[in-house]
Amino acid sequence: MSGQILWGIMPYIVLTIFIGGHIYRYQHDQFGWTAKSSELLEKKKLAAGSTLFHWGLLCVVGGHVMGILIPEGVYASLGISEHMYHKMAIGAGLPAGIAACTGLVILTYRRLFDKRIRKTSSPSDILTLLLLLFMMLSGVAATFLNIDSKGFDYRTTVGPWFREIVLFRPDASLMESVPLWFKFHIVIGYVVFILWPFTRLVHVFSLPLKYLTRSYVVYRKRS
C-alpha cells in the first residue's frame, strides 16, 4: 500500500502542486518571479559556482533524459549494449554530477558564510540550496554505488515507471526492485519539485525573450 502511494499517487500530487503553485505564484507575486541576483555583493565565488553548477546540471538533465525517457529498446536497435550504455553513463554522468555538486558547495558556502550575502538571504534561499545539494549528492552517491560493471540498470525499472506516469498509467510494481539509494534520490526530487514554485527556482521559466528584440542600452560617460 505504501509503495502504491509513493510511486503511483505521489507523482501526481507533486505535479499538481508544481503546476498549481507556479500559476498561483505568477498571479500573486510577479515581482518576486526573479533569481534575485546578488552579483553586486560578490562576484568571484558566484561566477565559479554558478558556472560549474549550471553546466554540470545541464549535462545531468541530458543524461536523465537519455536514460529515463528513451526506452532501452532504442539503444538495442542502435547496437548499444547494456554494458556499453553503462560505461557511457558513468563516464559522462559522474564528472557532470561532481561538477554540479562542486558548484553547489561553492554557492552554498557563499550564501551561508559571506556576511553581506547572508543578510540578504531568505530562509527559502538557504533551504533551496541545501535541498539541491542534497539531491545532487544523493544522485552522485547512487552513481558511485552503481559503478560496478554489473550495476543496476534503471532503464528497465525507473525508466518505464516514469514513462507510465507521464502516460497516466502508473505502475508502482516497477519500483519494487529498485535499490534504496535510487528511491531516496527520487523522493528528494519530490521535495524539490513541491517547493520549487515557492522559491527563487521559478526564475528557470523566466526567459528574457524581449532582450532579443529590444533596442540597445547606450551608456555615456560624464564629460
From Swiss-Prot:
It catalyses: nitrate + a quinol = a quinone + nitrite + H2O. Its EC number is 1.7.5.1. Gene3D superfamilies: Transmembrane di-heme cytochromes, Chain C. It is an enzyme of class 1 (oxidoreductase). GO terms for biological process: anaerobic electron transport chain; nitrate assimilation. Binds 2 heme groups per subunit. Heme 1, called the proximal or heme Bp in, is located at the cytoplasmic interface, heme 2, called the distal or heme Bd, is located at the periplasmic interface. Electrons are transferred from the periplasmic to the cytoplasmic heme. The lineage of its organism: Bacteria, Bacillati, Bacillota, Bacilli, Bacillales. Its main location: membrane. Heme b 1 binds at residues 54, 203. The chain crosses the membrane at residues 2-27, 46-68, 82-111, 124-147, 181-196. The keyword Cytoplasm does not apply. InterPro entries: Heme-iron_electron_transfer, NarG-like_domain, NarG-like_sf, Nitrate_red_gam. It is found in: Cell membrane. It comes from Bacillus subtilis (strain 168). It is a multi-pass membrane protein. Pfam families: Nitrate_red_gam. This is Nitrate reductase gamma chain. Residues 69-81, 148-180 are extracellular. Keywords: Cell membrane, Electron transport, Heme, Iron, Membrane, Metal-binding, Nitrate assimilation, Oxidoreductase, Transmembrane, Transmembrane helix, Transport. One of its GO terms (molecular function) is metal ion binding. It comes from the Bacteria. Disulfide bonds: none annotated. The gamma chain is a membrane-embedded heme-iron unit resembling cytochrome b, which transfers electrons from quinones to the beta subunit.
